[in-house]
């Protein structure tokens, strides 16, 4: 095979690797070629024709040319320049240049920059207005009269995000971008990911918040704006002066528009991007090709849900309860109240009478200081975080089998896999950017997707095969599939021999897991499971993703273990496109656990009960540490009821809504002697507190987050804290110092340096190595090298071998005669968790105003109810009143309740956890949220739908196609390739 090819570029020879994109190669040599429709994250679209060059004497598009032979390329001769000018003129026929008074004139308009760099002075074809008005969606708008039909938005929607809503209607007299079958944006299947606005090269597709806000002269009335445009064009005889003026105005904007790199504060994908702010106003969020987890992708929350930052419900002063009511006080008074109460409770009841709950929304550095406050200052290990509610069982299963509690590869590996298996994960709504990667791999590259879930969500609809097991029975089919693979000699014997131990004992434990047994337990036909087993064993590479549908069961740890067992038996670790992916739910739930906010583990999962580990931290902290493991979240609540816990300090966590059996939890709060809540808002939980401290959200501080793929990323402060609110790390430091300790951190980087000193998993992490969009995936070695794929040098056990873990199953699902309905629950795309942050963005509240219950058509018919009916759901622990949405996403007596009940407005009204019980996974104390049953009472039989009629779930269908279908443009009678117009 030839290693390099000779490419002669403008008279100079280069050695180039075969398969290189010609346009990318030309750019790499600092040679300018216009390329308006090309985007490095999307590849060639071939609509603009501006990138024409001469290849071996023929004018061709460089963007779609792959270097597969020696070639001679010319970018500067007259024929090339004539072809390029023709293409540029055609663009200006569709797009009016009024840069100085355009909101997009911020230095990154690709039409402006291309025309300027090319040196275009006059356009040949007069601009032609099109017979269309602007179309406004909730978050972005489309201006057909500025659209050049480059098709980037179509490519992004169809083949990057895979929402499959946008296309270009090439058959019109005046082609334009349309949504679905030509409906307004707000009536379409659009999910508002915003990627169309991200990739648009001009002002045709733009964020609503930008319009009238970005420029010095763009906030005028439309008529005045048009007059200014005409005046500007008349005053400037050539584009050179126009560009000079607009460039000066763009430079002025830099003084007031700040662009700050940050990391999304919602789910665990870890999307990074620049946030554009003007004073405190958030204009837009702009991801980058350099964003390591997401590239140019976003979801509706990361792109648009920032209303919480400037919400009028933000806390700006500390609150102290006096005579039963909250009063605003200065910081010193609030800190004194906390210090006095902590001291008196510790003196009276001992340090273990105090407890601390850390936040998965806060930074690594802040989570570290919370556990340090508990352990060093107070002397207790009663510290935990919300991974207890969701991810602890997955971590347990991985610790048992492979030794690290995190994703075994990167998000890229989810794209590379030949087969993806999704179990108990509503990925398209809970981790939408990850789902897009998988949807793309399936659509464009043939990845096979298998989904096991009790509910038919989007990924189930798209799956090559969809299986619906009975609730809580996944362990049965996982183990039966593994047994079948071994029984039929389909297991990876070489991998097992070299890298796995305990095979014989494990195989014996599978004796009862026959396919017949699995069919009886799960309801999945034996033939389907056999076919799956054979496909899984024979696939070149397999990844398994799972989430709360697995972990929030009373056998969550064992089911997670069964997943890893299957991967080991089939040899699906230690290679690209393979491995275990417990998709983390919060932006920093991985990091919060990594960094030691756990009752039995300090940083890097080092045991607090190990003498040598404690000795290391005692030397750093200057105190003796408590050698006894503390209480987890579940045990804290029980400890309050039992009189063992007298104080609770939690931050960034609405425990009174999100914990299971919240009637029991709220009753515990009322028994506390002293409670501190630290948050952006006066949350439902905060209403029980004695002191409420105003905390700053992510845009108001520096720090790091660790995402689901173990990726550590920096976020930078974009705004000053609102009012007297403070970053959490500063609050913890102030409390520690009030309690006579001498914490003196000047910046979160100093906290990370301390973490790195104490934590082998983070040993090489530093802010310098995380500068900008740089990132590291733990374990990070002292020299700064990291491990995007785990276990390449062996598994995380002393002998380097993984361990197969024997399991048993007796967790049969049984329908209760009284509580005859099974209650499933989870996230919606538009909201996050209880919705405290997302409901502060009005258009998200408009899309999904309140919580509701999904009911199957057959259950609705059985109970005589219709869309919008009001029902009371009653379980053994409580009751909730909700409106009904009838949908075939659920079947039979399965119902689904989203987590978001807008608790700050509604309290616990309609909260799912009024129905859940206190049962837990025996190994991790994770509540079995998904193991809930209820009965139903009908209040009204029909009513107004709980969903906005413009919500994409309401009778909206996707319209998939491949790319922009540029061949339809080329087939139009009015199209001629510019290269063919060049007079030879």
Swiss-Prot record:
Residues 257-313 form the 4Fe-4S Mo/W bis-MGD-type domain. It comes from the Bacteria. [4Fe-4S] cluster 4 binds at residues 264, 267, 271, 299. GO terms for biological process: formate metabolic process; respiratory electron transport chain. The lineage of its organism: Bacteria, Bacillati, Bacillota, Bacilli, Bacillales. This is Putative formate dehydrogenase SAR2393. [2Fe-2S] cluster binds at residues 37, 48, 51, 63. Binds 1 [2Fe-2S] cluster. Binds 4 [4Fe-4S] clusters. Keywords: 2Fe-2S, 4Fe-4S, Iron, Iron-sulfur, Metal-binding, Molybdenum, NAD, Oxidoreductase, Repeat. One of its GO terms (molecular function) is 2 iron, 2 sulfur cluster binding. Its cofactor is [2Fe-2S] cluster; [4Fe-4S] cluster; Mo-bis(molybdopterin guanine dinucleotide). It holds the Pfam family Fer4_7. [4Fe-4S] cluster 1 binds at residues 95, 99, 102, 109. Residues 138-165, 181-211 form the 4Fe-4S ferredoxin-type domain. The keyword Oxidoreductase applies. InterPro entries: 2Fe-2S_ferredoxin-like_sf, 2Fe-2S_ferredoxin-type, 4Fe4S_Fe-S-bd, 4Fe4S_Fe_S_CS, Asp_de-COase-like_dom_sf, Formate_Dh-H_N, Formate_DH_asu, MoPterin_dinucl-bd_dom. It catalyses: formate + NAD(+) = CO2 + NADH. [4Fe-4S] cluster 2 binds at residues 147, 150, 153, 200. Residues 3-79 form the 2Fe-2S ferredoxin-type domain. Residues 79-119 form the 4Fe-4S His(Cys)3-ligated-type domain. In the C-terminal section; belongs to the prokaryotic molybdopterin-containing oxidoreductase family. Disulfide bonds: none annotated. Its EC number is 1.17.1.9.
